[in-house]
Amino acid sequence: MDSRFVTYFASAISASVLVTTIFVCWNVTHDLNTLQAMSDRNMQDFKAISDRTWDKMMFKQQSSPPSPSLIFGRNKRSGDKCNCSEEPSNCPGGPPGPPGEKGNDGVDGVDGIPGFPGENGGAALDQPADGTCIKCPPGPRGPPGPQGEEGPSGDVGEDGEPGVPGNDGADGTPGKSGAPGGKGPQGPPGTPGRPGQPGRKAIGEAGPKGPPGAPGTDGRRGENGTDGDDGVDGQPGDEGDAGKDGTPGEPGPQGEQGTEGQPGTDGAYCPCPARSISKVAIQ
């Protein structure tokens, strides 16, 4: 019994360790795949940003204005010109060249840096023309213009017409039964039914005891009862307090004379001689 329990316990631990290992391996593989996908996406974003930056640099280089030396310089030009007189400075230009091809939609550019301060203005180089104008033949047709810049965003188009109503959808599944409805209003009284068959006389069982009836009226007053017997004598009460002293009584009658008293003792002035019976008798 003990060996079998140990075997089952070891098998359970091995199975749990195996499942945990498989889960950890799958989690690590998933994290690596996620990291690789994020790296590829970042590389694609970086490549797209670098391509757009390179296109902007090329476009800026092609559409950059000429240098100040080309604007303010005095470069001589040779070619077909009017040799009849001095070359005027106010001849009309040739016809405009054909419009260039429509440029591709460019990407949104980044905000440019603030421009440098402009140079101080100088005196105009053109000489004022005199009253006489020598009309020269128009110059040759100019070359096609450079590719135009990206046009502004077009206005929002108008709302399209409402589409054709769709087909009716399929019938939905029956809904759950609703809660019982409230009690409806009382209907009108029905028509009286036909009289029933005569009933058979039957004696039913006694019904349950009914509730108590109402109290009856008061009865007549009863006659007076006979006198009761005398009660038993009560026990003597506690001893009362002493009464007050009475008034003094009247003096009683005078009493009879008493018998002669015994001889008294000697005085304290001096001792007397003893008395004899005969002397006492004489006195």
UniProtKB/Swiss-Prot annotation:
Cellular component GO terms, alphabetical: collagen trimer
Compositionally skewed regions (Pro residues) per UniProt: 137-146
Composition-biased stretches (Acidic residues): 226-240
Record-linked InterPro entries: Col_cuticle_N
Source species, domain of life: Eukaryota
Pfam families cross-referenced by the UniProt entry: Col_cuticle_N (PF01484)
Subunit structure: Collagen polypeptide chains are complexed within the cuticle by disulfide bonds and other types of covalent cross-links.
Function of the protein: Nematode cuticles are composed largely of collagen-like proteins. The cuticle functions both as an exoskeleton and as a barrier to protect the worm from its environment.
Protein name: Putative cuticle collagen 79
Species: Caenorhabditis elegans
Lineage, broadest ranks: Eukaryota, Metazoa, Ecdysozoa, Nematoda, Chromadorea
